[in-house]
Amino acid sequence: MRIKITKHFLLTGLILAVLQACKPVDFTNASVQKIADLQGVPKQGYQGMAIYNDYLVSLQNTGQATIYQLSDDGLQKLHQFPLASLMPENHANVAFFGTERYKKTDEFPLFYVSQCSKQRYNGLKDVCFVERISLTEAPKLVQTIILDDTEGLFGYALQWMIDYTHNYLIGYGNTIENMGKGNRWRTMIFPMPKLSDGAVVHLQPKDAIDNYCIQDLDPRFPSNHIGQGACVIKDQMFIPVGLGTEAHPSILYIWNLKKKCLDHILNFQQQVPHEFEDCDPSHGDLIMQTNGGGAIRFKPSKK
């Protein structure tokens, strides 16, 4: 009898642990605190950002990068360098770390950067640069991912992000332009390209696992707003928007990729009257890079 009871409690505990791991994090009443000011290069706006363990990589327009040590109460600047993809056509709007390493001994996984600019790169748009970065060595461009958008499915601001849970590469962005008449926001999901796929990878719309416009599924998501970065946590896509102004407030939309609906619309304009940029999770919190307000920590409410 004791053995059966022990097994029962172990099984119950395991089920509860699995359910807790699958439960979305609630940022509805999140506490908001500034971590620190950013120390990038002058005269270039802050854009993409990615976190690996306790390293935060902050990007600026054209592809300037700064690596910080992230702690509960601050940022320690470790290294500043231009990406291998540094160029006027690289807005470097979104960044994320992948799951592969260029070499097994590399300190960081591969680093992905969304070009996301009205200016085309070698005549191309919708480009994702894949780089090998380091604290000590020069960065190296090891792969370029391109969506062959012959149908005009996206405007100029296609942002790439990774769904770690399912190993998907997700493209998200406007169909015309942020404030354009008739604009919508499209999401396309692809299997994650591998480094072994080659130096240049062309994605075709026909190969997408899913392809839809958010407004077709949930009209609460506005067609016109100032889009910023994005990231995926479990089955949710976190979409920061706005300029931190009354006309374009700092809002965080949380899109459920599984249910295909908005889970939350969170207005943080009062707490963060600055332009949201890119975001990434860190130890259960959400870290947001801003223009003018430094790095911000959103700590979920405890129930």
Tell me the role of every PLM-derived stretch.
Residues 45-52, 91-108, 154-169, 223-233, ...:
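Structural signature of eukaryotic scaffold interfaces centered on beta-propeller domains
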Residues 63-69, 119-132, 177-191, 246-254, ...:
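Structural motif
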Residues 70-74, 132-140, 187-203, 257-261, ...:
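Short loop/turn segments immediately following beta-strands, especially the blade-tip
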Residues 213-255:
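Loop/turn-rich, solvent-exposed surfaces of beta-rich toroidal or solenoidal domains
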